[in-house]
């Protein structure tokens, strides 16, 4: 028996990696709270699923609060009265209500404290419901990705960084020369 092909990708752009409603199971474990837009990651995952496909989430509760919003910890994943919430200081979304009609959401806080959500896509409709369309905007996505790439390029090719890298290389090269 052959195992299914396993794909990896950024949840916020998952439908670019997994196309044509082809996936039957997508798992996101302790990653949504580290992403730039976790609700978009959920919706992109649902776009990639076939009808009846499952998005399985397993997260530590409210990590951004615990980590004081440092580094990648910018969002909290929580369960309230059996419903899934994504929130931070400025933003709170009841994901269960947001996805109503497009997907069913079963959320539970486990004995170990983890938040487990099983989200099942109800339909294979090509058109996203209006309340979900605002999270998926290809033009905006391209702009954001270009901005990230340009910032990365700037941060890694600035004159100061080039000089620093050049000096570091020369020092390393000199040490190696004398070590031989």
Describe the function of each predicted region.
Residues 1-14:
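Class I SAM-dependent methyltransferase SAM/SAH-binding core
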Residues 27:
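A conserved beta-strand element that flanks and buttresses the S-adenosyl-L-methionine
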Residues 75-103:
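Short alpha-helix
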Residues 33-35:
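A short His-aromatic
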Residues 39-54:
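A short glycine-rich, Lys/Arg-flanked "PGG" loop and its adjoining helix->strand segment in the class I
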Residues 4, 54-84:
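Conserved class I S-adenosyl-L-methionine
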Residues 13-21:
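Short amphipathic alpha-helix with an adjacent loop that forms part of the alpha/beta core around
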Residues 137-180:
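Boundary detector for helix-to-coil junctions that initiate low-complexity/charged tails
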